[in-house]
């Protein structure tokens, strides 16, 4: 290979991971669970599986528990719209909110996400994951509890903005943190599990709202205020668990022995984020912003966020306006869509991990399915049929991002590019929180024909951006393969 080719090759192809602290020593390899049969080292699968299982418990397991309460916190604000509505003690009545003001209290949350989300991944690298996660989790728990004290529109706007600012960094920071521990091909089922637990907690939020509705008036406190207090307290407890027990990086993980730490630290691609990597690199950012996938993935995240995911911000109200349930039972009817999402997403994660299906074709299929659901919702009038296809649409919408995230992360290189790229990409999804409450405003109910029509347009944009991203990533893969052959 020429020196010119070598320079091109560096930045698009990773070197073989160094599997041992002493690569020249077969004994050293054996100690790290690596054998040398011929030229290519092979990893002991039993040792690797056991080591990764430990990481799964401490990293994926903990983050999944935290994500349950993070999603409950977000989802329950939509549930609060109809809690104790008939009793006259609902949140809109007590805070004197009109339709426009209610939409603003929903969307201000996403504005703070857009502002604070892109930088949070880098802050995690600067301050260490355990410390930064403590800050995020503690402050969103405290802000959630504080929102129960809101007395008017401006008070709730301030509380919601503070919650969004604290929660903004959590999801992209989790993905970024995982990239320090796992190979890209190991991420699909782990991201699917983590994300689907959050979707299941959206179902639990409906159950929690249903139960809390019976606390209305207890100690002179309205049901919706109890809801915000109860959902915020667990986050404060989990924040201290993160501070003292969340592992930062493979090299410093207290629950691993020396052999396991060395193995995990040496197995990743050189382009993957690393604990010793820079926290800021202007050249890496220039390369990131010149990559066409930075823009095509961003458009996809916006298109799917508004077209597919936006309905989630108004789902309790949409279900209530189907006309065959009371507000109390409507909380329970929010559960099936998210249970379906949990089952569907974990099934997809299982199939993706075993290469039975491919992420790109699966993501396109999801978008097409949502389009079909919206067309049916647009044309039929039967409430039961509408509810069934709402379940299908919500389960598909909630599964799209986790399916394509590993491909998005694979297209990023290095600690800085990965951090900024993950944060910025996920921030684009917050347009759903800005546009969703307005697209699904009650002024378009109960049919929501205008809402479904607008979302159809965004889903078409979603598919185009997805196909372009697929093209650019595939082109890069071909370039890598060609250089490998030289």
Describe the residue ranges of each PLM region.
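Helix-to-loop junctions at the C-terminal end of transmembrane segments
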Residues: 115-128, 343-358
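Extracytoplasmic gate region of multi-pass secondary transporters
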Residues: 78, 283-349, 401, 405, ...
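Helix-breaking motifs and short loop linkers at transmembrane-helix boundaries and internal kinks
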Residues: 73, 95-96, 127-128, 149-155, ...
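Structural signature of the two symmetry-related core transmembrane helices
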Residues: 131-145, 360-375
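Conserved MFS/SLC helix-loop-helix module at the cytosolic interface between two early adjacent transmembrane helices
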Residues: 114-154
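Glycine-rich segments within core transmembrane alpha-helices of 12-TM secondary carriers
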Residues: 188-221, 228-235, 422-436
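Intracellular terminal tails of multi-pass secondary transporters
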Residues: 1-79, 83, 99, 243-278, ...
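Extracellular/periplasmic helix-loop-helix junction of adjacent transmembrane segments
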Residues: 78-114
């Amino acid at each position: 290979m020429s020196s010119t080719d070598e320079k091109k090759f560096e930045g698009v192809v990773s070197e073989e991971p160094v599997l041992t602290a002493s690569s020249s020593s077969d004994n050293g390899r054996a100690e790290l669970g690596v054998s040398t049969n011929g030229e290519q080292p092979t990893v002991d699968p039993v040792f690797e599986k056991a080591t990764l299982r430990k990481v799964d418990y401490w990293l994926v397991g903990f983050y999944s528990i935290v994500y349950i309460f993070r999603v409950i916190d977000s989802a329950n604000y939509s549930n609060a719209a109809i809690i104790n509505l008939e009793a006259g003690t609902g949140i809109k009545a007590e805070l004197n909110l009109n339709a426009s003001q209610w939409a603003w209290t929903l969307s201000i949350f996403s504005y703070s996400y857009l502002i604070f989300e892109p930088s949070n991944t880098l802050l995690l690298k600067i301050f260490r994951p355990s410390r930064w996660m403590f800050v995020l989790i503690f402050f969103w728990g405290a802000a959630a509890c504080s929102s129960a004290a809101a007395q008017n529109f401006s008070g709730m706007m301030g509380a919601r903005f503070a919650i969004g600012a604290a929660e903004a960094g959590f999801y992209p920071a989790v993905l970024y943190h995982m990239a320090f521990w796992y190979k890209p091909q190991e991420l699909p089922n782990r991201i699917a599990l983590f994300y689907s637990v959050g979707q299941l907690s959206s179902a639990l939020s409906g159950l929690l709202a249903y139960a809390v509705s019976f606390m209305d008036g207890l100690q002179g406190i309205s049901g919706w205020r109890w809801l915000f207090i109860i959902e915020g307290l667990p986050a404060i407890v989990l924040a201290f668990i993160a501070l003292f027990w969340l592992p930062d990086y493979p090299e410093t993980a207290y629950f691993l022995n020396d052999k396991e730490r060395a193995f995990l630290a040496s197995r990743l691609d050189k382009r993957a984020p690393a604990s010793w990597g820079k926290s800021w690199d202007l050249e890496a950012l220039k390369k990131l912003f010149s990559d066409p996938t930075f823009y095509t993935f961003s458009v996809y995240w916006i298109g799917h966020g508004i077209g597919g995911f936006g309905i989630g911000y108004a789902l309790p109200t949409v279900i209530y306006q189907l006309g065959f349930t009371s507000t109390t039972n409507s909380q329970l009817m929010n559960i099936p869509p998210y249970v379906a999402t949990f089952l569907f997403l974990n099934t997809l994660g299982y199939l993706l991990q075993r290469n039975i299906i491919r992420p790109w074709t699966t993501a396109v299929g999801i978008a097409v399915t949502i389009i079909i659901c919206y067309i049916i919702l647009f044309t039929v009038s039967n409430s039961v049929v509408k509810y069934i296809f709402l379940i299908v649409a919500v389960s598909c919408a909630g599964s799209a991002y986790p399916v394509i995230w590993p491909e998005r992360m694979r297209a990023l290189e290095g600690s800085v590019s990965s951090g900024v790229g993950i944060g910025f990409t996920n921030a684009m999804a917050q347009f759903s929180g800005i546009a969703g409450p307005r697209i699904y405003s009650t002024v378009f109910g109960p049919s929501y024909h205008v809402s479904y029509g607008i979302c159809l347009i965004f889903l078409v944009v979603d598919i185009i951006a997805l196909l372009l991203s697929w093209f650019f990533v595939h082109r890069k893969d071909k370039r890598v393969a060609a250089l490998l052959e030289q």
